Swiss-Prot record:
GO cellular component, one term: membrane
Region (Disordered): 57-78
Protein source organism: Schizosaccharomyces pombe (strain 972 / ATCC 24843)
Chief place where the protein resides: membrane
Compartmental location: Membrane
Membrane topology field: Single-pass membrane protein
TM stretches of this protein: 19-41
Biased composition range(s): Basic and acidic residues: 61-75
Keywords: Membrane, Transmembrane, Transmembrane helix
GO biological process, one term: mitochondrial proton-transporting ATP synthase complex assembly
Source superkingdom: Eukaryota
Protein name (Swiss-Prot/TrEMBL): Uncharacterized protein C3H7.08c
Amino acid sequence: MSIMRSIMSNRLVRWSREYPELFITWCVMTYTFGVAGYMLGQRGLLVQHEDQVRIPSKNAHPWEDTKSSSGKSDESLDYSYKYYPRGDRSKEPRKAPSAIQYSTFPVKGVSEEVLERFSK
């Protein structure tokens, strides 16, 4: 066993003297994978994100408009997105602009039949 150790240590020493830049890289990579293995062994891969969520009790979702004029149930709620101007919660939330932009332009030189087929 001691003979095998001396052979292996001599090979490692010779290799490290011949390729010093690779030896340093090998040491850094060994250390990195060792720390990563230790951390994964300690914490595991099970993360429960639901435990870390904190929902504020007052006005948590500004896009849910609970001030319905008719007093109806959830069908009358306005769920369009709203935001606080500059993140200031003391101001009234504003309605955000629509994400869908429509543009119309005239089409020339195309028959009505083709227009009807592609306008659906």
